[in-house]
UniProtKB/Swiss-Prot annotation:
It is found in: Cytoplasm. This is Thiosulfate sulfurtransferase GlpE. SMART domains: RHOD. It comes from Yersinia pestis. Its EC number is 2.8.1.1. CDD domains: GlpE_ST. One of its GO terms (biological process) is glycerol metabolic process. Residues 17-105 form the Rhodanese domain. SUPFAM superfamilies: Rhodanese/Cell cycle control phosphatase. Keywords: Cytoplasm, Transferase.
């Protein structure tokens, strides 16, 4: 795959429920701590190396941001780092929270 794929929040949710994809959240630390999808890896410049060590490059990766814009650049970057299949989630966390409020956790819970 040379280009990331955009995926709807519904498709992303189904992939996430199957447990076969890695889900990364690239929002700022305060937003991530306030609420994120359970099991989402908080991907930052400082955590990128850890993520790359812990994740198989042939495992699909889904990237979530605020609204589905910043995730596109991050998804393309992950492809350039060698990940085989990367998705950018359309609508980002905003769409996830609106569609699946029951599947949000926070660091304070």
């Amino acid at each position: 795959m040379e280009q990331f794929e955009a995926t709807s929040v519904e498709q992303a949710y189904l992939r996430w429920k199957e447990g076969k994809t890695a889900l990364v959240d690239i929002r700022d630390p305060q937003s991530y701590e306030a609420g994120h999808a359970p099991g989402a890896f908080h991907l930052t410049n400082s955590s990128l190396h850890t993520f790359m060590q812990q994740t198989d490059f042939d495992q699909p990766v889904m990237v979530m941001c605020y609204h589905g814009n910043s995730s596109k650049g991050a998804a393309q970057y992950l492809l350039q780092q060698g990940f085989d299949v990367v998705y950018s989630i359309d609508g980002g966390f905003e769409a996830w929270a609106r569609s699946y409020p029951q599947d949000i956790t926070s660091e304070s819970r």
